[in-house]
Amino acid sequence: MIKKIAVVTGASSGFGMLTALELAKNGYEVIATMRDQKRNTTLLSEANSSGIADNITIHELDVTSAESVSLFKELVGRVGQVDVLVNNAGFAGAGFVEEIPIDEYRSQFETNVFGAIAVTQAVLPIMRKKSKGKIINVSSISGRVGFPGLSPYVSSKYALEGWSESLRLEVKSFGIDVILVEPGSFQTNIWTRGKKVTENSLKKESPYYEMMRKLEDHIESGSSKFENPKNVARLITAIALKNKPTMRYAIGRGVKMTLLFKMLVPWTIFEKIVLSKLR
């Protein structure tokens, strides 16, 4: 049986961990990467209990470090094959534009955008030589719809979307597919431990303090309705197994309706609805 190799970044938790497990269950040999290998406990425990531990190897990878990416490139070079790359590593920067230091924007883009680019550049030569491969980029509905207080995250996902479109057109003729997965709200730590709010917007003297508080309340009040992240992992795995995947896969309660609504109604109406969520 011909082995299939998948690489998943940000695999210590959330979509990344669940996707690594799901791919392994479906016959892939998974290279699960994470910035801190000490956070591999849950992944290893789940893999052992599911009887798929032999299908998963864990490697340290900081997508923002040139040295770390170089070591990763050497690793996949030795393996000589990558059938699927899942660019999942990321976090959510929050706060209001006037108050966010430019370095925090840079940090957001270093992980969510430049990190994905660096890892993709490491595997593309292998995929191109094999004339096959799938690059699945985990975006978000935030890559299609803006929201106040989340401009670092939103802008990084918009950038990922545009880059993915260009990349798909560049590598299609080499037998490589580039796919975007756009989740809505799911039960991961992206809005808890994975969220980094600029300190200035948390100060009571901030002119945006009330809006920041309402944003936090909005996220917290909706958390009970967040969906099972395993659904996203299953979708990513289905895409990996699909012969001719399309460009975008939106997933989550109300996501497709929101995208359609934004496309059809005048912006003035759409913005009133968005702003009403923070009243």
What feature does the model see in each segment?
Residues 12-14:
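Conserved glycine-rich cofactor-binding loop
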Residues 58, 100, 108-109:
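A hydrophobic alpha-helix adjacent to the NAD(P)-binding/active-site core of NAD(P)-dependent oxidoreductases
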Residues 96-97, 104-106:
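Substrate-binding pocket helix/loop in short-chain dehydrogenase/reductase
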Residues 50-67:
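Rossmann-fold cofactor-recognition segment
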Residues 120, 156:
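Active-site helix of classical SDR
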Residues 140:
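Residue(s) in the substrate-gating loop at a strand-loop-helix junction
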Residues 172-223:
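C-terminal beta-strand-loop-alpha-helix "lid" module of Rossmann-like NAD(P)-dependent dehydrogenases
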